[in-house]
């Protein structure tokens, strides 16, 4: 079984981006939607320059397609994460217009069924945000995510992950990747180097 990849999201500075990549993060996420961690495209471009070897993920919520295209061009974003109510047709168009893979996020308490996921025919990855607090995601939702992963979908697991629970979450689901934001922060948008290093070590354990 391949190790789970790691996405560190909510990066707001080139320094934190470089630290995440130095510790082994595969994906660096920048939030371009309304959020305490939101940054503008110019800042995203600076982060891109700081980590040229990493995969940069731009996070959007119900965006205009032109805004996605501009962000991809300006900040050289590698993957488009859609965190709102985007329909399959929008995901298709985002891929067609940018050439960048799409990560579609589902935030509901119930993980969507296979038929719903299958409608996203050109979507490369699905991210399941299974919990909003700092506890390990509920067992039933972990079971659902694991079942979907076994069907061949490439799954990012997110929600409530931190250094204290990520090892168990990975063991329960064997996701393609884990996604952490708040669980490795000292304050919104500021990463805690110690927590970040511990998180990476637990994923690799």
Briefly describe each language-model feature range.
Residues 1-205:
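Conserved N-terminal beta1-alpha1 strand-loop-helix module at the mouth
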């Amino acid at each position: 079984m391949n190790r789970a990849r790691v996405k560190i999201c909510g990066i707001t500075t080139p320094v934190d981006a470089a630290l995440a990549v130095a510790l082994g993060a595969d994906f660096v996420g920048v939030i371009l939607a309304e959020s305490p961690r939101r940054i503008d495209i110019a800042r995203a471009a600076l982060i891109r320059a700081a980590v040229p070897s990493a995969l940069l993920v731009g996070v959007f919520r119900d965006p205009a397609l032109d805004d996605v295209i501009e962000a991809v061009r300006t900040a050289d974003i590698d993957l488009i994460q859609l965190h709102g109510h985007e329909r399959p047709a929008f995901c298709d168009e985002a891929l067609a217009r940018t050439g960048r893979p799409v990560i579609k996020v589902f935030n509901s308490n119930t993980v969507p069924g296979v038929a719903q996921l299958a409608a996203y025919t050109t979507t490369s990855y699905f991210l399941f945000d299974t919990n909003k607090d700092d506890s390990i995601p509920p067992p039933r939702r972990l079971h659902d995510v694991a079942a979907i992963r076994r069907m061949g979908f490439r799954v990012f697991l997110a929600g409530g992950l931190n250094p204290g629970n990520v090892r168990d979450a990975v063991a329960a689901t064997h996701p393609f990747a884990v996604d952490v934001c708040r669980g490795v922060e000292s304050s919104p948008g500021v990463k805690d180097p110690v927590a970040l290093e511990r998180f990476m070590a637990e994923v690799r354990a």
